[in-house]
Amino acid sequence: MSRWRSFGLLGGFVVAMLGFGAWYSYEQLHAEPEIPVKATLTVYTDLPNNVTSFLADEYLNEAQVRINVMPLTGEQMAKRLDSNYLDQRGDIVLTSKDNLMLGAKSDHLLGMYSERMDLIAPTFKDSEGRWVGLWYDPVVFTQNTSYYNRLGQFITTWGTLAKEGPWTVVMTDFMTSESAANILHSFVEIHGEAATVAYMKSLGTHVTQYAKYLDTPIRLASLNEANIGIGNYSDGSFYVRQGYPVKVIFPLDGTPYYLTGAGILKSSNQYAESVQFINWLLSAKTAQEMQKAGYSYFFTNPEVKDPVDSLGHPLVLLETQGGYTVEGKKSLLEIWLKQVRFGQ
């Protein structure tokens, strides 16, 4: 009896192995072929993980080059690009204009040139080719459709927004977001510290909430919980695509913007491959793929058409130079915190 049991177990094992073998062969036959990798580039960045993952996957599929993403915070990136930071291993940095200007000043970045980079407006690149802007996210006003149809459509400038009136405003707390704080930095560069503080105090009389997250003002405006939400174009476009009753308005008197760009580290021994990747980031095709994936920015490539706002107006940017230091930013935030945020 035990002999037949042994034969049965052996037979079952053989059948199981044959079944596994057939399944494994089927999986191997239908599995996607592994992409051959020609090179690997190490990229330091403080961009959101979803953006860098998307770009890395797209470039691997298209160019067979793996992007090794090294995520940092904005503050860590600033320290890395400071002149006192000597360990500059890696190939590329993807970060804000301020950090790129710091890296150029600290002599950490190589000059780079290409026909595609030559097309980019001087406003969006370094005069010596040490960095180039890829895309930018401007600050916009957002309003619920019902409020927009009544009074909101006439609030089209920063000047009007801070005047006396019955409207309510939600904006992101400058202390919680580098992107939001760029409003403060830009206004001080254009108008000076005293005039900016006075303006922010006037605007503060309308502010019902300083939000923690960037998209909160837009969400509250779209839900008609606030008349006007001050936020980024990328977030406003997201809510429009999701079908929320929200209108996006570009301030006619100019608006701050957050420029993201790229530079090649002097430590890189893959200069040609790095330039090719940055050229790819600048391409109209990459911009179109990003837009299809839901990443709504203004692209520095002049071949990519710029959108207009809900009134049909084109974007007007404040003519700022940027390059604000970490110490300068902290000082301005302290002034805003004491005199505006808690000094009403």
Regions found by a protein language model. Give the residues of each.
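A local structural motif
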Residues: 37-41, 62-71, 89, 193-211, ...
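Periplasmic-binding protein-like
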Residues: 119-123, 137, 169-175, 199-204, 210, 281-304, ...
